[in-house]
UniProtKB/Swiss-Prot annotation:
Belongs to the threonine synthase family. Pyridoxal 5'-phosphate binds at G270, N271, F272, D274, T449. The gene is thrc. It comes from the Eukaryota. It comes from Schizosaccharomyces pombe (strain 972 / ATCC 24843). This is Threonine synthase. Its cofactor is pyridoxal 5'-phosphate.
Length: 514
């Protein structure tokens, strides 16, 4: 199979980009996100043909549908995929765990940084290196193309990006994270990496402040042109593409168990990237009847699917001086006010429901109007018919902090299995789904996004009262032993300020290249 897919911007200002251009640019010049010119279909008979394939083999098949052979040959792509997933600790890469309550937990945390983002960022790091090596060939040092990756993290993206890019030639990586708003393990995973091309920057604010700074960097045409800015956040299409694989792989796992008559996926999500990959899988032909969004108390997605209003802050997050920051929860990777990837889905929604002739140009015009209204007013409301169409694709649930802790307890009591707080948001949502559909024969797959050791505060809060529980012996991996005591390197930037950030990047790059 070989793809002829090209890439276009959701805002309509850029089209006919190659896969390489979409990956290296990350964000289109008009501020839009890259999407494929068409969604390819899974080949006829794919279930029987792929059911016994390994995770890397399925990843190769999926990526071949989106990457033209003229850009990356079959042999080159296979080597990239195999290299990317050889770093995972489990032979199945993303294994399924069946719980006694009937839920199936898809363990996505067996990569180098113990988080689902390794699935995408191990591949993306190798992809960056592949493209740059090809571009640079034997060029002298002062003529080589150099990529400056700038990303924001609420915890897991940062460490996964760093582990995917550390030591890569012709790549520098700058990761912004909110001071005091990531877990100690997450911060240590980032700041203890000593490779000279890795730079961590703390911001006195929240994740959305970091994400806004990254967007401003991408929006600065001159700065972007000078430093060749690249993206590792889920705005980068390659991340979404990589994540499609585990939806197909897990479906085939339950298919082989004879449990695939009605399969539904539950996805804890804040930025909408993880579940968007499931949407693409469904559009490609994956026979799943439902995608279930699980949010924490920062519930912009849940509120949209309940009301049709996409609104940055709810009434509890508004002060006399205006909207305030995301609520601090036990699932910090989802403490997000604005879901960056939701723009991609809104484009497809506009194409299907609002574009008179269902053309990409019309969809981009409508999407741009929605996003401009959202930027101006902090809210945008879609028509009831549009909301009805959205509800055919997704349903959603909101899980509170207390319910998150209770879910960790429930699964420990029933299965002696320990889940992290983000997975707990998904599991609690799954328990509600099971209750609502208890008379139906449905297979639920809940995505488990991180290893519980990364969130000791929440896990210990939930389980410390159990006499048979011991964090160090039951949860803590040997890879984390002593990590908190290692020497750290970090740049403190103070309050969010784009000029200070640009100065930090320029000074650091000049030192790195000296």
């Amino acid at each position: 199979m070989s793809s002829q897919v090209s890439y276009l911007s959701t805002r309509g200002g850029s089209s006919n980009f190659s896969f390489e251009e979409a990956v290296l640019k990350g964000l289109a010049n008009d501020g839009g996100l890259f999407i494929p010119s068409e969604i390819p279909q899974l080949p006829s008979g794919w279930i029987e043909a792929w059911k016994d394939k390994s995770f890397p083999e399925i990843a190769f098949e999926v990526m071949s549908l989106y990457i033209p052979r003229s850009e990356i040959s079959a042999d080159e792509l296979k080597k990239l995929v195999d290299r990317s997933y050889s770093t995972f600790r489990h032979p199945e890469t993303t294994p399924l765990k069946s719980l006694k309550n009937g839920l199936n937990v898809l363990e996505l945390f067996h990569g180098p940084t113990f988080a689902f983002k390794d699935v995408a960022l191990q591949f993306l790091g190798n992809l960056f290196e592949f493209f740059l090596t090809r571009k640079n060939g034997n060029k002298p040092e002062d003529e080589r193309d150099h990529l400056t990756v700038v990303g924001a993290t609420s915890g897991d993206t940062g460490s996964a990006a760093i582990y995917g890019l550390r030591g890569k030639k012709d790549v520098s990586v700058f990761i912004l994270f909110p001071n005091g708003r990531v877990s100690p393990i997450q911060e240590a995973q980032m700041t203890t990496v000593t490779d000279p091309n890795v730079h961590c920057i703390t911001v006195n604010g929240v994740f959305d402040d970091c994400q806004d700074l990254v967007k401003q960097i991408f929006g600065d045409v001159e700065f972007n042109k000078k430093h060749h800015i690249g993206a590792v956040n889920s705005i980068n299409w390659a991340r979404i593409l990589s994540q499609i694989t585990y939806y197909l792989y897990s479906y085939l796992s339950v298919y082989k168990q004879g449990k695939a008559d009605d399969v539904r996926f539950i996805v804890p999500t804040g930025n909408f990237g993880d579940i968007l990959a499931g949407y693409y899988a469904k559009r490609m032909g994956l026979p799943t009847k439902q995608l279930v969004i699980a949010t924490n108390e920062n519930d912009i997605l849940n509120r949209f699917f309940k009301t049709g209003r996409y609104e940055k802050a709810d009434s509890t997050q508004v002060s006399p001086s205006g909207p305030i920051s995301a609520k601090e929860t036990y699932s910090p990777a989802m403490d997000i006010l604005v879901s960056s990837n939701f723009e991609r889905y809104l484009w497809y929604l506009a194409l299907a429901t609002e574009a008179p002739n269902h053309t990409p140009a019309e969809a981009s015009e409508i999407l741009s109007r929605w996003m401009n209204e959202f930027k101006r007013d902090g809210t945008v409301t879609v028509r009831p018919e549009v909301l009805e169409a959205a509800r055919r694709d997704f349903v959603s649930e909101r899980v509170s902090n207390d319910e998150t802790i209770d879910a960790i307890k429930k699964i420990y009591e029933s299965d002696h299995y320990i889940i992290d707080p983000h997975t707990a948001v998904g599991v609690e949502t799954g328990l509600r789904c099971l209750e609502k559909t208890k008379d139906q024969d449905i297979t639920y797959i809940c995505l488990s996004t991180a290893h519980p050791a990364k969130f000791d505060k929440a896990v210990n809060l939930a389980l410390s009262s159990y006499s048979d529980y011991n964090f160090n012996t039951q949860v803590l991996p040997i890879e984390f032993d002593g990590l908190l005591d290692e020497e750290r390197t970090c740049i403190f930037s103070g309050k969010p300020n784009i000029d200070i950030l640009k100065q930090i990047i320029e000074v650091t790059l000049s030192r790195e290249k000296a």
